[in-house]
Amino acid sequence: MRRQEPESPLVPSSPVALVVQKFGGTSVADPDRIKAVAEHIVATRRRGDEVVVVVSAMGKTTDELLRLAHEISAAPAARELDMLLTAGERISMALLCMAIIELGEPAVSFTGSQAGIVTDTTHTKAKILDIRADRLREALAAGNIAVVAGFQGVSTDSDVTTLGRGGSDTTAVALAAALGADACEIYTDVTGVFTADPRVVPQARRLSRISFDEMLEMAATGGRVLALRSVEFARNYGVRIHVRSSFTWEPGTWVVPDEELEVEGMEQPIISGVTHDTSEAKVTIVQVPDRPGVAARLFRALADEAINVDMIVQNVSSQGHTDISFTVPHADLARTLKVMEDHVDEIEAAGVTHDADVGRVSIVGAGMKSHPGVAATMFETLAAEGINIEMISTSTIRVSCVVAEADVNRAVAALHQAFDLESAS
């Protein structure tokens, strides 16, 4: 699969000293796509830029490796699972290097460990502690394109680790920060960040720019374009991200600091997008004694099991008791119910209920900070559609509602229309 390069350059015409490019699994799913990505990288290098590439495993390789692991063991040892899963990126990085060399440019591949990505000791969900990028700098200084396996590092105990969901995005942004890159380009199977999921709202519009804070909220509430941790890295270290498609030459979406938008004199829209997430379940602890310390004990027990709790709602107390509802990822539901059931008698609550058939719909926009009535418009829109709101949470630039899963797509479409996002400038 080869693409003809357009007359206009891929990025602004002025040379960039150093660019980090990340390519996901769909971009390198087969040899033809790997060759196309190699041409893309070589074109950037021949424009005069230094290039560091971060690559994911080919296609569904990681899923296939996970399937194999679970055929062997119902609960694979975490250390060995990390050893297995990192094989996927090692394959793609080596093949991509071969393709680049075949085009006449020098390239060197690095595992996460060889690239100096140091993590904590948490297998399958490791956090990056440090990046010792000396070998990458040496490779660049020698005129090489450096190709790094995403999603992996080495722990302080010298064990191979993986970074969890979205780990290759996080690898790319972290390397861009450590190397002082001028930009981090994230190549995906979509052309950028949209005002809603185009599969749900065909009229959804691609955003040319969005702030770090808005992107963080979108990533946290169901936007799948960028991993949440990668956006956190970008905001903390001021790394500008360009999200674009591997398959077209269309301009993508720049994710930039808030102040960059302000300097350019761009008035931020009230709402930038509508997101949705159907990967969570609602859990309710019924008739919890309303006294100090009870909620703390419940949520400490969940934290000790590394269960991430999202939205939390506590009903108004009645006769000394209250209901506490919260959401957790579907993958953690069984463990959550076990932890809560172990504590129900201890805290003298009546019981635990759950609903796995829910979804979250959110509106995100920096402009809502200075515009009253945004939440009211959201609630009125959902009411007009006959959609019941089960839970509500807010931040300064986001309002989220939990609704029945069957109503999620209808809610997204209605909110997108209510805030006129398809025609916003």
PLM region spans:
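Nucleotide/pyrophosphate-binding catalytic subdomain
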Residues: M1-V231, T327, V402-A404, F419, ...
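Acidic-aromatic/histidine active-site loop/patch
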Residues: A234
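Active-site phosphate/pyrophosphate-binding segments
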Residues: F247
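A conserved regulatory-domain signal marking ACT and ACT-like small-molecule sensing domains
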Residues: G252-S425
